């Protein structure tokens, strides 16, 4: 009778209980070695069921023969008396002895049956869960493999060796307690580590490793296994090697892999489970213990190759609670995320088994997601199932987030594409409806037609308009947009639209005087220009250029001219423009092309005769072959600009009616051909008196209005303004002084607010004290009343008190919100009528900081060799320029290095002036004082203080000469005299520029006499009387005249004897040298 029952444990074998005669049992058990137990089978798993069935598997029948053991006793095949039953000698014994043996065998079989019954109830080996290495093999494969293994062991040859010399399977029995594997081929890998449970492709490049793998396959080795370890430093030069150099070269934990198929250097492997590195033998360092055990190992063939092989031990998972809340939560979350990403991955055949095993699930997820090798190695090394799940979940979450972002991006792209497609369909549909209805062009064409009704377009422009208009509706969307944009620009150009000029000189004078103080010469020139226009009836073809320092009001003057002429004002800033297309536009073939700045300015002005200000024309970038400058040659030429063609419009535009006004700081930067086309009007810097008046009339009222103060709240006397100009802003313009005035009003506003707040705080504190006393009295009365009410009815008191508090709270909240809204409303502060702040010269530094210009002069008393020149810069500021000359060595030193050395950041022109002055000074001294041989032995160092400031210009010649002559005569120059002018080798004094600004600088520094070239006398008429007041101008033509003014009363004897003693010492030295030489 046979009874079968299923075990409760998952994947357990069916237990079969059979009642069989003992004689049958004796005959059946005689063929089975009694020493082999099911729980002693190999820990290495058989081939996994999840592999493809069509692959040529190269694997042994059993894996238990691959383990090594430490116990020699376990290596010996155990015997049993039951095995002797089959021998012929047994049959010759007596019946009594035979019965006795049969009874013993029955007892042994009963014991074996009990042992087998216990082992049969254990879980079988899971092919996809190699961690449970000590479990039984499955009923479908384990029993067959066991029988086959026994048969193989019984049929081994007598020599016990394979053809290649490796031991037969019979030499490898059950593992010892240590559970160490025999030496396996060890391979290092740089890429992502392999996790158990999934087939992978491995690429090897080392020839010895390839030979070894091929030998394992071709020789039918029953152990096609190797261990795979990940390299620690993947950035090292040896990271790509397959052979392990030493133990520290790889991580301690790797995977045991089975070779399934090889194709050249590619190996298809199946990682079974984790292993830990115990010992390793490398080609550079062989391990004695491994080499000794290799002689009795089935993998001894590895010694034939220059490869690394290692002894490893299976790394099992730590026990865990299947009911753990954390594990179950993470497992559930992983399953949820995996289901979302499942279409991306290949689904395994044993998916249900993987999903039910947390450890297998962690490995499976980690093998699928994108991650760095270090992250995968961390999961591989972890034996804690909970940790593995956490790490795998983190990687899967990142994968899910990235996939969600990708899906969102694709969705947005799809929606935009569908929307654009729908709009395109609607647009085409609308066009067809309009065309079928005979309505004609869309509303844009109607808008263009309405525009040209108010224009007097020339024939060429009208022809271009009609041609492009006909193209509408017949082009693609891209061409359609280009045509519409062209028509839009073309119909905005004000063809034939003009404003009527006003030539009222009186009105123009009023406007100029209203907006500007001073600048008499500039105003006169502008009024003359308007008067000529009134007589001729037009101001066509005029190009003005206002040249002057920054901040002198050139731009505002242009606005005033436009207002005086009743013309529209438009401005073009060309500073830094280098591309001609910025001026003349791009052709329509370019994407997003537009007209140039000239046509754009016309469309903004909406008239064909505006005043067009071309600002900063001296800062045109001329480095790119002068492209933009060449474009302005056509625009500013009255003979050519009546047919200006923009590259975008491609139609002639008349610019002859435009009044061009250019501004520049330095005329020398404007190309010569362009400068010749302009009528130059110089806008000189303001004098000190001009600055004071402009500050009082314009700057102070504007600053007061800006901060919201009435005029008179902040009082700035003339003395304060004068000190502000002298000590803070000496430039010719007004920008810096304007910023300082604004700063004064900002500081004054702050002082006013702080003073008012202090007053409010004092009054608030007083009100608070009185309010506190009243509140305390009220609280006392309320508490007494409440006490009486509570004694009468506590419940009614509580209820009524609660209602009162609620009503009070609601009312107080509403009041607070209203007050908050009132506070948020910005209101102008009411100031007391008597509140004023006066800025005195003594308190000026409290508003604008410490003084910038402390001293007006560098030298109060000039030393011999120091001369005072005058300089002028492009910002319109004039100042004293000191020139110092000294002897570097005494004349009697006899060094023989006479010459000149110049410093002070001088440019080429000033260096030439110094060299010319040195040559002329030597000639002049020889002619005037022949016995003064100063320049024959003197090495002179000439320096201009302020080396950080570059200096250049042809106006310091006489100052250099005077400095050298002063040093040669050892006589100081007058303290009250400054000079300017260039000199030639013959002593001629040449003309210079900027005498007005230099006069301002000399007067500010305290000089009362100015020596200047006689050829510049005409400039005196341009200098205001207030500047010339207190100054004496000395015109000179030759340097001899300069010498007479600077060195009055010096005789020839005095000049010849200046260095007489030094030269006597020099002669004595020369004589002594000759004597010593003889």
Swiss-Prot record:
Active site: 955, 998
Reactions catalysed, as given in the entry: Hydrolysis of proteins in presence of ATP
One Gene Ontology MF term: ATP hydrolysis activity
Binding positions (ATP): 548-555
Organelle targeting sequence: 1-27
Compartments, record wording: Mitochondrion matrix
Residue spans of biased composition, Low complexity class: 127-157
Coarse class of the protein's main subcellular location: mitochondrion
GO CC term (a single one): mitochondrial matrix
Domain Lon proteolytic: 861-1049
Biological process, per Gene Ontology: cellular response to oxidative stress; chaperone-mediated protein complex assembly; mitochondrion organization; oxidation-dependent protein catabolic process; protein quality control for misfolded or incompletely synthesized proteins
Compositionally biased residues, Basic and acidic residues: 71-123, 158-172, 815-825
Limits of the Lon N-terminal domain: 182-400
Transferase keyword on record: no
Coiled coil ranges: none
Keywords for the protein's UniProt record, in alphabetical order: ATP-binding, DNA-binding, Hydrolase, Mitochondrion, Nucleotide-binding, Protease, Serine protease, Transit peptide
Region feature (Disordered): 71-179, 792-825
Keyword Hydrolase: yes
Assigned EC number: 3.4.21.53
Family per record: Belongs to the peptidase S16 family.
Subunit structure, as described in the record: Homohexamer or homoheptamer. Organized in a ring with a central cavity.
UniProt function note: ATP-dependent serine protease that mediates the selective degradation of misfolded, unassembled or oxidatively damaged polypeptides as well as certain short-lived regulatory proteins in the mitochondrial matrix. May also have a chaperone function in the assembly of inner membrane protein complexes. Participates in the regulation of mitochondrial gene expression and in the maintenance of the integrity of the mitochondrial genome. Binds to mitochondrial DNA in a site-specific manner.
Official protein name in the record: Lon protease homolog, mitochondrial
